[in-house]
């Protein structure tokens, strides 16, 4: 998985008094965090959880569906990025199923938080670690949440033998390395905006909801990624407007110099003789 277990790495931590469940708490949440205040739980990137956290299937479904919606509206590669989200959900399930937990440093990398932004997370992890273990495994039923599924992808049965694998160069989970965000920007693939397919004539009206769609590389009807194209057009328009304004200001400045020079060379009012007969 993402991180090796303490036993594999040879690390050891003393258990905290009364921490009969979590014997490696310092590896997971560090030192005991101080009491949380209103600012910690309401502002900043780390204000997404509080101690006493429980699994709410309805909230989980709505949150994941919201991310699917963001992908459908803004991604240039809807199918590929939807698979990324599904892999994330599966990997976190497997971490719990195989009893592997991220270290605090691993949490910071996964959630992209600074050490000063992990107060709520650390307090929540510490509280959960001191809960008594559940007696037996349980199952979560699908909640009855009335929402429109945003992952609008079709099942193509006759794909002509096309490769259905990802083309993003994904690496196996056991060799994943955390990289700087600046290094990620060098990969131009994430900034590809796919054009609408001219061959796709199917209507895209899932569940009676009309909307534009295009057929992606996997042959699936997905919402047309128009937002990135609009963003590019707005950026180009802003760049053109900025260039035009700069050019106008430059011309105005040059014209102002000529105007001052002409005004200086022009005859004064008292030097101009009055008209004849005045």
Curated annotation (Swiss-Prot):
Acidic residues bias (residue ranges): 155-169, 183-205
Compartmental location: Host cytoplasm; Host nucleus; Virion tegument
Membrane-spanning parts: none
GO biological-process terms attached to the record: regulation of gene expression; symbiont-mediated suppression of host gene expression; symbiont-mediated suppression of host mRNA transcription via inhibition of RNA polymerase II activity; symbiont-mediated suppression of host-directed shutoff of host translation
Post-translational modification: Phosphorylated in vitro by host and by protein kinase ORF47.
Annotated segments matching region Disordered: 1-42, 154-229
Annotated stretches, region: IE62-binding: 1-142
Lineage: superkingdom: Viruses
Keywords for the protein's UniProt record, in alphabetical order: Early protein, Eukaryotic host gene expression shutoff by virus, Eukaryotic host transcription shutoff by virus, Host cytoplasm, Host gene expression shutoff by virus, Host nucleus, Host-virus interaction, Inhibition of eukaryotic host transcription initiation by virus, Inhibition of host RNA polymerase II by virus, Transcription, Transcription regulation, Virion, Virion tegument
Record bears the keyword Glycoprotein: no
GO cellular component: a single term: viral tegument
Subunit text: Interacts with IE62; this interaction modulates the function of IE62. Interacts with several components of host pre-initiation complex including GTF2E1, GTF2H2 and POLR2A; these interactions lead to repression of gene transcription. Interacts with host ASF1A; altering its ability to bind histones.
Function of the protein: Immediate early (EI) protein that functions as a transcriptional regulator of cellular and viral mRNAs mainly by interacting with several general transcription factors thereby disorganizing the preinitiation complex at certain promoters. May additionally help to regulate levels of histones in virus-infected cells by interacting with host ASF1. By inhibiting host transcriptional program, IE63 plays a major role in the ability of VZV to overcome the innate immune response to the virus.
Annotated family: Belongs to the herpesviridae ICP22 family.
Protein name as annotated: Transcriptional regulator ICP22 homolog
Organism: Varicella-zoster virus (strain Dumas)
């Amino acid at each position: 998985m993402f991180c090796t277990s303490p036993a594999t790495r040879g690390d050891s931590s003393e258990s905290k008094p009364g921490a009969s469940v979590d014997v490696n708490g310092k590896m997971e949440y560090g030192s005991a965090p101080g009491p949380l205040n209103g600012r910690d739980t309401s502002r900043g990137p780390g204000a997404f959880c509080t101690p006493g956290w429980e699994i709410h299937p309805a909230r989980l479904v709505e949150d994941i569906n919201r991310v699917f919606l963001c992908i459908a509206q803004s991604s240039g590669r809807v199918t590929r990025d939807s698979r990324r989200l599904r892999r994330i959900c599966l990997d976190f399930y497997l971490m719990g199923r195989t009893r592997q937990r991220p270290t605090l440093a691993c949490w910071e990398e996964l959630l992209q938080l600074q050490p000063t932004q992990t107060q709520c997370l650390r307090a929540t992890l510490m509280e959960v670690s001191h809960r008594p273990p559940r007696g037996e495994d349980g199952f979560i039923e699908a909640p009855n949440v009335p929402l429109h599924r945003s992952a609008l992808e079709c099942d193509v049965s006759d794909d002509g033998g096309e490769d259905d694998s990802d083309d993003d160069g994904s690496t196996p989970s056991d060799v994943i390395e955390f990289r700087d965000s600046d290094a990620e920007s060098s990969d131009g693939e994430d900034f590809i905006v796919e054009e609408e397919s001219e061959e796709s004539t199917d209507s895209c009206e899932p569940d009676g909801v009309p909307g534009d769609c295009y057929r992606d590389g996997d042959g699936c009807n997905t919402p047309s990624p128009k937002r990135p194209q609009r963003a590019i057009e707005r950026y180009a328009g802003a760049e053109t407007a900025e260039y035009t304004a700069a050019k106008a200001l430059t011309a105005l400045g040059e014209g102002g110099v000529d105007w001052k020079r002409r005004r200086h060379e022009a005859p004064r009012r008292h030097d101009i003789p009055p008209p004849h007969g005045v």
